[in-house]
Amino acid sequence: MENKHNFMETESITKLLIKFSIPAIVGMFVNALYNVVDRIYIGNIKDIGHLGITGIGVVFPVVILIFSFSLLIGIGSAAAVSLKLGMKDREEAERFLGVAVFLSFIISVVLMLLIYFCMDKIIYFIGGSDKTFIYAKDYLFYINLGVPAAILGLVLNSVIRSDGSPKIAMGTLLLGAITNIVLDPIFIFAFGMGVKGAAIATIISQYISMFWTIYYFTSNKSKIKLIKKNIEFNFYKAKEICLLGSSAFAIQLGFSLVTYILNTVLKKYGGDTSIGAMAIVQSFMTFMAMPIFGINQGIQPILGYNYGAEKYKRVKEALYKGIFAATIICIIGYTSVRLFSSSLIKIFTTNLELEEITRYGLKAYTLVFPIVGFQIVSSIYFQAVGKPKMSFFISLSRQIIVMIPCLIILPIFFGLNGIWYAAPTADSIATLITYILVKKEIKKLDKLEEKLEKRNI
């Protein structure tokens, strides 16, 4: 086991980043297709496409909520496994894997029951109207049946990367996404199921991915094994998993809360069409942000393993190169939106009113997108090295501490335009806060490196 993971200490950081991040980027990029492809197909349903895409936009906070719990357990357990493997403790890593599976099951059951019994109230509470209710409910009912697959599949796939198999993790996401892309037009158009068909295609894809990840950890393919006796509740391990996953959880939970508030203020200042426009804008944001989360998925085991092995110089190098790569991706996304926004929006809708609002909103929402990568990668750094509280604060700084006040205050003075410009305002302030914290952390790493050198003399 030790020999299999020694390359994490000796291989060049650039090669490791490519090995782990490229598959993760491709995987997360493809994973974004789950929601984006649904919206593209639904938006092109004759006569009701604009209402269908608005209905999906209404329930999007719930979809994000489900995803946030999968990240809480997935990123947390992956970080714990990486740290234990860095310490050469395989058995403890396997125990964390078992606890992660147990937590995934319990959380899935609780979420499914809550959503099922409160579905109608939830839809109206998060921005549904009489026009969009039927489409929102059709989608959410079936998506709710896929909660166990959505959570456990992503949790196990996150740990696959920490197990040293990033290509297999990428393949898992590709399997699900390609299945979804193939099934969507069949269920939506061929079977005439519309919005229901999109949701059914999605959950079938998620269950296929989930069963594959279970097979991986019970076969000879994996280095650490999913053992039945380890699938149990352990308070201390559950606490550590949740602490280590709290940053990613906060980002997505905050995103869910922000999306709910967005739906509320959009309904007040712009009506159903504005909610539909935001659904399309968020599709682009998801598509552009997922590669950055892919870098996070890839860099996390590199940071965690080398920090656990006291290779602080390599930790700093990985952080710098991760930030650089994320920034390049952000710049590409920013440029694409400004050059090709009209053509890209037409993929989702041919409704002229919806298209016009979306075009303006997309350019405003992504105004400072090039700086977003720095904050996201910095957050995963603190999480990977076992400092979840700092990571949690960085995540909250953008999603809660700054963004929500902007969404409440700016529309009072600027109406609908204030809603669109809330995101770049929050990103600018949060990035400044993150820069100050990262600068202090780098100084601490320098001191740890000096102590290590003196100890080895």
Kindly give the residue locations of the regions a language model identified.
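Small-residue-rich hydrophobic transmembrane alpha-helices
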Residues: 53-113, 150-169, 277-335, 339-341, ...
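Short alpha-helical transmembrane segments in multi-pass integral membrane proteins
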Residues: 1-21, 81-148, 192-245, 303-368, ...
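N-terminal transmembrane alpha-helices
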Residues: 9-48, 61-76, 80, 105-112, ...
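Transmembrane helical elements of multi-pass membrane transporters/channels
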Residues: 19-38, 142, 176, 205-209, ...
